[in-house]
Every structure is written in structure tokens, then in C-alpha cells.
């Protein structure tokens, strides 16, 4: 019995710590540095996520960042599923740990991204119908309004109802709520700009980032 308990605790520790360390990998920073685009923390909003990497003008690096940030959520969930034979509580903890790792990466003094790509990676690997529904929501909102943050916030709000509709286990529903709350907290500045009608459209720079107008000719 003691051996079984030790194995269970070890498995839990691997799922949580492993998920967090995976989530902490700053793909945006790695991609921009290796790709010659500089330090992403000094570009645009300073965020390490794919949306800000796109502001560097490098769509290839933004795509790499998106895949990497989503992929670490996928790997964390699949690892937990393999280790526990599909235990929904451990899977939710591993996915949540990867998500927290992206938001608060140990390698960057706990200053990370907003978690949207990792959120989708966790959803797709833990319950793919929910991930597809949330992704479709993002695409629809982005197409209609051309505002990335609004699309992400809408998808986050609807993730738990989607989980309920697809009859997912309670730990996964709790994970959806947990991630949605943190996504809203991390997007508080975006929400303030949305309320003022100042949130930039997809592909547009923030007003503060735009070059000042040229002076009139004498």
C-alpha cells in the first residue's frame, strides 16, 4: 500500500511540476531571439505571446510561437493521461499547471504571457470537442470584429458551457473556469481599452506604438 501511495504521489508531482516547467518555456522569446528579431519583451506590448510576436513583422515567428505555446499545453495533458491512464483530475491539474507556467514562467522571473494559445492547447488535448468549439468561437469573433482580445475573452467565457454541453468531467469544467478567470485578469488592460473603444484591430499597432506624424514642411 505504501508503495502504491508513493507511486501515486510521484505521478501527481510529475504531472504538476512537469506541466508547470513545460508551460514556463518562453517560445516567443526563444523564437524572436533565434530568428534575429530581438527581444520580444522590448517590442510592442512586451508580451511574450504570438499576438505580440506578430507585431515584430515576422509572421513565421508568430506561427512558431503559437504552435509552441499551444504545444506545451498539449504535451502536459498527454503526459498526464499516459501516466495516470486518463485520470481526469490529474489531467486537469497538469493542464492547469502548464497554463500557470505560461503566465508565470520561472525562467522569466514569473513575467509571462496571457495564456490564450496554451489555453487552446490544453482544451484540444484534454477534450477536443471543447477545444474545437472554443477555437471556432475565436475565429468567428475575430472575423466579425477583428479584435483578438475580444475573440479570446469570448472563447474563454464559453469554454465551461461547452464542457458542460459535451458532458465533460467536473475537474475539466473547473479547469475551464480557472483558466477563464485568469485570462480575464491578464487581459484587464485590453478590457479597459475595449470599453473605451480603443482596442486595436488585428494587424494594427497600438496608438502608442505608431510612429509620430512627420512635421510639416517649412
From Swiss-Prot:
GO terms for biological process: phospholipid biosynthetic process. One of its GO terms (molecular function) is acyl-phosphate glycerol-3-phosphate acyltransferase activity. Pathway: Lipid metabolism; phospholipid metabolism. It is a multi-pass membrane protein. Its main location: membrane. GO terms for cellular component: plasma membrane. Keywords: Cell inner membrane, Cell membrane, Lipid biosynthesis, Lipid metabolism, Membrane, Phospholipid biosynthesis, Phospholipid metabolism, Transferase, Transmembrane, Transmembrane helix. The keyword Repeat does not apply. Its EC number is 2.3.1.275. The keyword Transit peptide does not apply. It holds the Pfam family G3P_acyltransf. It is an enzyme of class 2 (transferase). The chain crosses the membrane at residues 10-30, 60-80, 88-108, 125-145, 165-185. It is found in: Cell inner membrane. It catalyses: an acyl phosphate + sn-glycerol 3-phosphate = a 1-acyl-sn-glycero-3-phosphate + phosphate. Belongs to the PlsY family. Probably interacts with PlsX. Catalyzes the transfer of an acyl group from acyl-phosphate (acyl-PO(4)) to glycerol-3-phosphate (G3P) to form lysophosphatidic acid (LPA). This enzyme utilizes acyl-phosphate as fatty acyl donor, but not acyl-CoA or acyl-ACP. HAMAP family: PlsY. This is Glycerol-3-phosphate acyltransferase.
